[in-house]
Design a protein with these regions (language model features):
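Short, Lys/Arg-enriched N-terminal segments with co-localized hydrophobic residues
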Residues: 1-10
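Active-site metal-binding loops of divalent metal-dependent hydrolases
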Residues: 41, 68, 92-93, 123-124, ...
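Ser/Thr-glycine-rich phosphate-binding loops at phosphate-binding pockets of nucleotides
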Residues: 61-67, 120, 138-139, 180, ...
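Gly/lys/ser-thr-rich phosphate-binding loops in alpha/beta enzymes
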Residues: 88-90, 95, 107-109, 142, ...
């Protein structure tokens, strides 16, 4: 696992990377108190998350998954068991163990940190992005130089187009983009950069985008048959 620490004035912002699934996890705190939240944790790294939190003297109060992941088992439930944090997902989530379901445009608060939920279906029908000041956590909806596949978990290329072009790409151009995955060593981007340079976004219509996405012919994620039911039921790997 790799992790990167950014201190923005008082704010604590850590980006951790799971090399097996190429998943980014984010640990965030305002720094003005001791409360923290985590976005998109991977179960294998639960001990590392706890270690980071303890080293920074932070208390985990909320943990968020942007959607039901198909390429890894979430650490959301293990973190809940070990810290009693609140498990958060969008209201469309199929998860059976969520403590707090967030509606589109609803806000999540952890001390002085505020995230606004944006319903961004397409990769899955339960995908949400989260806007925090100058940055947006896009899950698998908008990637760096790519977009999330739309061929499983009730995904829809047409819905993805609407989420991208009518929601995310309408954010201010200098908004930082932090996705749930990257496969080329990139840590973040901006809305302007993705709008101008992302090859998946250089289309002239919803139909053209759907034509591209519906003909990718990708293999299913290796962990899909394990990860999806585990993430819906709230299971840990040792319970499968």
């Amino acid at each position: 696992m790799q992790f990167f620490i950014v201190s923005l004035l008082l704010m604590i912002f850590e980006q951790l990377f799971d090399t097996k699934s190429s998943t980014y996890t984010y640990i965030i705190s305002s720094g003005k108190g001791r409360e923290a939240l985590i976005i998109d944790p991977v179960i294998e790294h639960t001990d590392k998350y706890i270690e980071v939190l303890n080293n920074l003297e932070l208390k985990l109060v909320k943990v968020i998954d942007t959607h039901i992941h198909a390429d890894h088992v979430t650490g959301l439930n293990e973190l809940n068991k070990r810290t009693k944090c609140t498990r958060v997902m969008g209201e469309k989530s199929k998860s059976e163990v969520i403590d707090l379901r967030i509606k589109d445009s609803e806000k999540i608060n952890v001390e002085n940190i505020e995230l606004k939920a944006i319903y961004t279906p397409g990769h899955t029908d339960c995908s949400y992005s989260y806007l925090m000041n100058d940055r947006v956590f896009t899950g698998d909806t908008l990637l760096i130089n790519g977009t999330g596949r739309t061929d499983f978990q009730n995904g829809s290329a047409e819905d993805a187009y609407d989420s991208l072009f009518n929601k995310l790409l309408k954010l201010p151009k200098d908004t930082l983009v932090y996705p749930a995955h990257d496969y080329n060593g990139k840590k973040f981007s901006t809305i302007e950069n993705e709008k101008n340079n992302n090859p998946r976004l250089q289309v002239s219509s919803k139909e053209q985008y759907a034509e591209i996405m519906n003909n990718l012919n990708l293999a299913n994620p290796k962990m899909m048959d394990i990860a999806v039911p585990a993430n819906v039921k709230g299971l840990s790997l040792i319970h499968i």
